């Protein structure tokens, strides 16, 4: 009977390299300075014999775990599958009967390696014990080495030692491989003293350690906390024995320097390494950067690289990239560009990763022009960008608010035949969602489908967000339901995206239905969930339910954030609850929260509605004197009319562009609040101008629609003042078209969307009632609610033409040729109407009165 004996050199070495970890990540004590010429000292340790094993869970047979087809020979594959399905007390002998004399020890070694990869030490040990009792498959040293390594990796040191001690009695000689496996087992489990003793023991047995043995011991001692002198002693010892250190040896020492913060020692190790002709790799440079980064001396790495280049040893691109990444993490643009220029001067050509690091650094610093310039430079230098480069650009411009530029990058990427990955799609669709680019989001989703790519949950969330920003509720809901069909489970972010979409439009019933699905899916409600519900109830005119949701939020111990407080303030402002608005506003400031520009506008609006001009002027002065936020100052000055001329209006446009970069969600809240304030302060012409700025930036895409049959204005997502502004602009536009002889068959005002519009109850919505009243005041009774839709207010062409031709304009309207006068009225000077104690009701504890108000609102009926 012939047994195929494996080549011990190749098999032992490959297995130990696969299962040894030379570079540790432990906390060490500080060491002394590097002295390569000294042998160093280490204290002898007493060998403790058997050590108690760590408790390990039993791995039971699992027939479903089968080996990959074609990975091994048929017999080896069959044996592995049989052993895998063997129950805990199943017979190993019966499994092996049909394989007797068919399998070599090489084949058995493959079986042990397969189970080692699974961490199945119990099954391996049972097979090993069975083989020890057989003649035809008695384990050789290779299998003993595999077994020791497997048990060591599982922390079973007593069993490791038991297997090792059995070798002589089983007629198996120990060699450097079995000793190294045992040394590694103790070392990786923190027993470096035992590893050192085993090293001495193998020498006493005339077994010469290999480079792998010394690397294992040095790594174990470095991780275990042996002092620096001891590590150098091992280093000197191996060199004394004629064993030349390799890249692993030096990297292990550099790792110890990095963790201990030994800068001078790291420098000397690196120099010795270069002098020995060892080429540094990525790990080498990473340890150097980590070491000197901790010491705030990254410039030292630059010096070392410069010395290498001047000495004729040109550092590779990896070294510079690691250093660039270190500077990028600290946001050091100047130093990073210095490294970039240094590598170019040294003749080292930047690669895609180099540019990616710099592009991300510029992007995170908001230097978008530099990002564009660097990307053009990258292309002109014949350095081809890869998917990772484009992903960084997409993320940078998406976060910066350059949403259309992100879509352009995607088209550029496709033209360059660079395959997008899921991160690419997620980044693009996220930008489309944030920017409300629903058509682009739809096209990218179709592109993915056409290429058999299943969108991730994050990608679907972006699509839903894009549809929601454009008030395309049906499409958003279809996308949400499609997720289930393709097996992509909605995340809490997906639910919130849909909730906020419905909330902005006041679609209360739809919002409640999605909330119910969220709860049914087992996802707990959090702050965003409550915030969306408060906004939905507010926009839908359900003020009592909005406040009740806020009370429920506090009861559930979910801490409100700034957006929560803003949402509650908007409820009070919409409901004209002045005292509650004031208390909410003052509590925000008392909590060291700077109220957002939206909050200031809400306060101005509610003061304007109730003609509290002293409070208006006081609040405007507070905005103008704000030293924390330039936005507050600019908007305050704009409201007062300081920026009306075109040259100064550019300042307003700059602020609006900055806000636009935050996405449509913030934009809708901002413009609604600002338009409300402008309208109620009598700044109607400025309100119309601001509304135009909003639509130019893609906000409220549903607002104005025209075709040959219908002209519509959709105000269901607008504040009261925003709605009045939009209706005024729309009516004046109709009037202009009449003068040109062009009128539609129908003029329609959309005041309510969603399920509610199917009911006549939609007419009781605050926005619907206010819109209808406004139309009655300005164009008599020609507009009326339709019978088929409770949220539509409509006028036929014949009535519209007759109405516009017979309406008597006011002098102001006649002068401007407008149907609705849009002018800026002077804001009343201070003292015109002082706020009295009875008006503001400052007395009493604000918190107690707030709680009382919540209970009263929540307990009342609509």
Curated annotation (Swiss-Prot):
Coiled coil: none annotated. PPR repeats lie at residues 104-139, 140-174, 175-209, 210-245, 246-280, 281-315, 316-350, 351-385, 386-420, 421-455, 456-490, 491-525, 526-560, 561-595, 596-630. Residues 833-848 have a biased composition (Polar residues). Disruption phenotype: Lethal without exogenous carbon sources. Decrease of total chlorophyll content as well as a decrease in the chlorophyll a:b ratio. Unequally expanded grana thylakoids. Altered expression profiles of plastid genes. GO terms for biological process: plastid transcription; positive regulation of DNA-templated transcription. Residues 831-862 are annotated as: Disordered. Mostly expressed in leaves, stems and flowers, but barely in roots. Residues 1-66 form a transit peptide. GO terms for cellular component: chloroplast; chloroplast nucleoid. Belongs to the PPR family. P subfamily. Involved in plastid gene expression. This is Pentatricopeptide repeat-containing protein At1g74850, chloroplastic.
């Amino acid at each position: 009977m012939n047994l195929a004996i494996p080549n011990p050199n190749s098999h032992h070495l490959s297995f130990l390299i696969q299962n040894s970890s030379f570079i540790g990540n432990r906390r060490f004590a500080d060491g002394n300075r590097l002295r390569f010429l000294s042998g160093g000292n280490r204290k002898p340790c007493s060998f403790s014999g058997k050590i108690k094993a760590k408790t390990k869970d039993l791995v039971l047979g699992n027939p479903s775990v089968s080996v990959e087809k074609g990975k091994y020979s048929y017999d080896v594959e069959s044996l592995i599958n049989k052993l895998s399905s063997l129950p805990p007390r199943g017979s190993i002998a019966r499994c092996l009967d049909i394989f007797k004399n068919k399998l070599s020890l090489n084949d058995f070694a493959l079986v042990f390696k397969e189970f080692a990869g699974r961490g199945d030490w119990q099954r391996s040990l049972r097979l090993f014990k069975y083989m020890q009792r057989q003649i035809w498959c008695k384990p050789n040293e290779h299998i003993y080495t595999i077994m020791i390594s497997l048990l060591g990796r599982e922390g079973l040191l007593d069993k490791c030692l038991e297997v090792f001690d059995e070798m002589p009695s089983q007629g198996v000689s120990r060699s450097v491989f079995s000793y190294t496996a045992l040394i590694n087992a103790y070392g990786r489990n923190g027993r470096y003293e035992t590893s050192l003793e085993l090293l001495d023991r193998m020498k006493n047995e005339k077994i010469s350690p290999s480079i792998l043995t010394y690397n294992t011991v040095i790594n174990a001692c470095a991780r275990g906390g042996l002092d620096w002198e001891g590590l150098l002693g091992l280093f000197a010892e191996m060199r004394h024995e004629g064993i030349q250190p390799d890249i692993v040896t030096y990297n292990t020492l550099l790792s110890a320097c990095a963790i201990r913060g030994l800068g001078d020692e790291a420098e000397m190790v690196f120099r010795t390494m270069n002098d020995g002709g060892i080429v540094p790799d990525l790990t080498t440079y990473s340890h150097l950067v980590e070491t000197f980064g901790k010491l705030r001396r990254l410039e030292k790495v630059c010096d070392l690289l410069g010395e290498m280049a001047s000495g004729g040893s040109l550092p590779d691109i990896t070294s510079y990239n690691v250093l660039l990444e270190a500077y990028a993490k600290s946001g050091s643009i100047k130093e990073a560009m210095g490294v970039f220029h240094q590598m170019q001067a040294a003749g080292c050509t930047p690669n895609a990763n180099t540019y990616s690091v710099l592009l991300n650094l510029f992007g995170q610093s908001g230097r978008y022009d530099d990002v564009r310039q660097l990307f053009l430079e990258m292309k002109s230098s014949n350095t081809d960008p890869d998917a990772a480069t484009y992903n960084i650009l997409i993320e940078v411009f998406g976060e910066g608010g350059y949403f259309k530029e992100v879509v352009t990058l995607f088209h550029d990427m496709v033209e360059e035949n660079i395959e997008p990955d899921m991160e690419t799609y997620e980044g693009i669709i996220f930008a489309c969602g944030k920017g409300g680019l629903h058509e682009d989001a739809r096209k990218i989703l179709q592109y993915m489908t056409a290429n058999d790519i299943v969108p991730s949950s994050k990608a679907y969330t972006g699509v839903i967000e894009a549809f929601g920003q454009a008030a395309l509720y049906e499409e958003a809901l279809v996308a949400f339901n499609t997720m289930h069909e393709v097996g992509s489970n909605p995340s809490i972010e997906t639910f919130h995206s849909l909730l906020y979409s419905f909330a902005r439009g006041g679609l209360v019933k739809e919002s409640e239905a999605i909330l119910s699905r969220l709860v049914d899916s087992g996802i707990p409600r959090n702050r965003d969930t409550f915030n969306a519900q408060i906004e939905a109830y507010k926009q839908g005119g359900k003020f009592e339910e909005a406040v009740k949701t806020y009370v429920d939020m506090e009861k559930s111990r979910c801490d409100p954030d700034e957006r929560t407080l803003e949402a509650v303030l908007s409820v009070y402002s919409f409901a004209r609850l002045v005292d509650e608005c004031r208390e909410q506003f003052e509590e925000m400031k008392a909590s060291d929260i700077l109220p957002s520009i939206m909050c200031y506008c809400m306060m101005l609006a509610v003061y304007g509605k109730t003609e509290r001009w002293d409070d208006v002027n006081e609040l405007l002065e507070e905005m103008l004197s704000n030293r924390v936020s330039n936005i507050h100052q600019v908007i305050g000055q704009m409201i007062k009319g300081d920026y009306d001329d075109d040259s100064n209006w550019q300042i307003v446009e700059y602020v609006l562009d900055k806000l636009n970069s935050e996405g449509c969600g913030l934009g809708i809240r901002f413009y609604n609040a600002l338009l409300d304030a402008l309208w109620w302060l009598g700044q109607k012409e400025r309100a119309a101008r601001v509304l135009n700025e909003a639509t130019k930036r893609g906000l409220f895409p549903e607002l104005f629609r025209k075709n040959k049959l219908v002209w519509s204005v959709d105000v269901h997502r607008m504040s009261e003042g925003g709605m009045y502004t939009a209706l005024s602009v729309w009516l004046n536009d109709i009037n202009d078209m009449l003068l040109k002889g062009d009128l539609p068959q129908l003029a329609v005002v959309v005041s309510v969307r969603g399920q509610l519009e199917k009911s006549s109850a939609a007419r009781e919505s605050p926005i619907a009632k206010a819109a209808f009243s406004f139309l009655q005041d300005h164009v008599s009774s020609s507009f009326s609610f339709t019978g088929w839709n409770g949220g539509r207010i409509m006028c036929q062409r014949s009535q519209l033409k007759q109405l516009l031709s017979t309406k008597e304009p006011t002098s102001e309207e006649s002068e401007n040729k407008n149907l609705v006068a849009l002018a800026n009225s002077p804001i009343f000077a201070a003292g015109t109407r002082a706020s009295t104690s009875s008006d503001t009701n400052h007395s009493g504890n604000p918190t107690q009165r707030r709680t009382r108000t919540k209970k009263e609102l929540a307990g009342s009926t609509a």
